[in-house]
Amino acid sequence: MSSYFVNSFCGRYPNGVDYPLHNYGDHNSSGQCRDSTGMHSGRYACGYNGMDLSTGHSSPGHFLSSGERTQSYKDSPTATPVRYNQPVTASSAEPSSDHLPCSSLANSPVSEQSHRALKISLSSTAGSASKSFGTVLSREGVSKVSSSMEEEKPPGSGQTASQNVSEAPQIYPWMRKLHISHDNLAGPEGKRPRTAYTRYQTLELEKEFHFNRYLTRRRRIEIAHTLCLSERQIKIWFQNRRMKWKKDNKLKSMNMAAAGSGYRP
């Protein structure tokens, strides 16, 4: 990354000769321009001859001229290292080991390795991003397919299944023991509708009751088969008929008693 950072500044800053800086140190030399060739080119990479960024001050007073400033830099013991204060010569113009020019940095094996590592890291990140994007797309495709399959299902299938479940009555054990037919049930309370007997059935039952008020189980089964009725219906009809007969006889006896008490010979 260090070589990449240095190489990015090579084409950004032009040579300092094209951009001279005015000297604002002395009021007598306000119109003069400073010679940029006297700057220390060995301090900068890529042969940059721009502004002198030395920060040594010999006196806290007013600003000094260029000659006095260079003299104070040479005389002061706390100034920067010697190689920054030497005049421009062939030896000083040569770049040091820590400030290499752009060409040497570009051709160095360290820079090539760093560039390769950077390219590998970028390619790996791009590959991982593409893989993750592909997985997201595949998941979205699966979800879309599932949603389309759900939409293609006919809406009446779920309703018919729910209707079949609701229509089938739940049969409990006590209902089976009582032999209750669910077709004859009417209303939430489970009351049976009143049985409507035909004229023929009523006449046959009245005839049988006239001869015998109480039926045996065998005779009750025979009458049920003959009249196409259930054994329970025959039993209930005979019970109701006996209650009616008792009521009629009671009224008849009461009337006869009243008539006998009123009749005096």
Swiss-Prot record:
Gene Ontology biological-process entries: anterior/posterior pattern specification; regulation of transcription by RNA polymerase II
An example Gene Ontology CC term for this record: nucleus
InterPro entries from the UniProt entry: Antp_homeobox, HD, HD_metazoa, Homeobox_antennapedia, Homeobox_Antennapedia_CS, Homeobox_CS, Homeodomain-like_sf
Keywords annotated in UniProt: Developmental protein, DNA-binding, Homeobox, Nucleus, Transcription, Transcription regulation
Localization of this protein: Nucleus
Pfam families to which the protein is assigned, alphabetical: Homeodomain
Segments of this protein annotated with the region Disordered: 59-108, 144-165
Residue spans of biased composition, Polar residues class: 67-79, 86-95
Segments carrying motif Antp-type hexapeptide: 171-176
Domain of life assignment: Eukaryota
Annotated GO MF terms: DNA-binding transcription factor activity, RNA polymerase II-specific; RNA polymerase II cis-regulatory region sequence-specific DNA binding
Start-end of DNA-binding region: 190-249
SUPFAM superfamilies: Homeodomain-like (SSF46689)
Physiological role: Sequence-specific transcription factor which is part of a developmental regulatory system that provides cells with specific positional identities on the anterior-posterior axis.
Family: Belongs to the Antp homeobox family.
PANTHER family, per the entry: HOMEOBOX PROTEIN HOX, HOMEOBOX PROTEIN HOX-A5
Protein name stated in the entry: Homeobox protein Hox-A5a
